[in-house]
Amino acid sequence: MDSTYGSLFTSNTESGNKQRKAVINRKTNETDISMTLNLDGSGKANITTGIGFFDHMLDSFTRHGLFDMDCNVKGDLYVDTHHSIEDTGIVLGKAIKEAVGDKKSIKRYGSMMLPMDETLVLCALDLSGRPYLVF
């Protein structure tokens, strides 16, 4: 979400502070995920999950949020997509938490409703620290 829509993340780069970044790796029996997230980016996305629509959604999240994200997911897609999506959500949450650090430069929660193509997108985000992902 950029400033046009009321960003959750106030940019640190305007005041000369370092960019807020995180690198998270998670390996389980079902998945192997690596993610680099820069909250003060420009919308660059390099996402490979093996799930086309999920890649598209993460790419849209990154581009419209003006974040930079590299995300590589290897999962047990021969079973189904559940583990890959769930574990990517866990990694994304950890990356956001690490990148915002002390939370001094953010608003705790925000929401956005956006008509995009034939879809109405509703996103609500709360950075209180309680884990939850709906896809």
Q: Model-derived features: where do they sit?
A:
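Structural preference for solvent-exposed beta-strand-turn elements
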Residues: D2-F135
